[in-house]
Amino acid sequence: MNKALLVIDTQDSFYHTPYWSVRDVADFQHNLTQLIAAFQRNQHKVIKILHSRDDVPDSPFNPASGFVKPMAFLDMQFDKTFHKSVHNAFTDTGLAMWLKRNNIDCVAISGIRTEQCCETTARVASDLGFQVEFVTDATLTFDMQHQPNGQRFRADEIKVRTELVLAERFATICKTQDFVA
């Protein structure tokens, strides 16, 4: 099986959002760094995905902000970079074609935010026929509040929910240690 690791939206833009929290960042950075090293050691492709949108001038995701760049801890070489403007890494990016040209049939998902661009990319990848390994501890998300009723959900609860809805249908749920051991 030929694999590629997708490192989704791990970019400076998030430092400038109202929901940014450093609570889980150290573990996320450690796990993602280990995961990238394991993929590179095993000669698998590592793909950087950046989210940009130019329709909102003052957004930290607008390229003019200067924040649409990898977080500093991602100082390693990537095999390819794709830019997206929607919630998944496939729509209008050329990623699927590139993966197929490189005979890649399995993608591992990592990055920011677990339940948004990472989960959405996993679902689309599955629909496109790729095997998907969702590396939950190499994803990052933040606490959220459900607007209609005010209920708060912690980041760890959101991750569990993401695993629940992806497992056995869209993805195999993995941990970083599954790749480095």
Q: Would you name each region that the model predicts?
A:
Residues 3-4, 33-37, 41, 59-181:
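Active-site-adjacent betaalpha module
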Residues 15-18, 55-58, 143-145:
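A short acidic, helix-capping loop that chelates divalent metal ions and anchors anionic groups
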Residues 15-25, 149-152:
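Acidic/histidine-rich helix-loop elements
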Residues 1-10:
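Short coil-to-beta-strand
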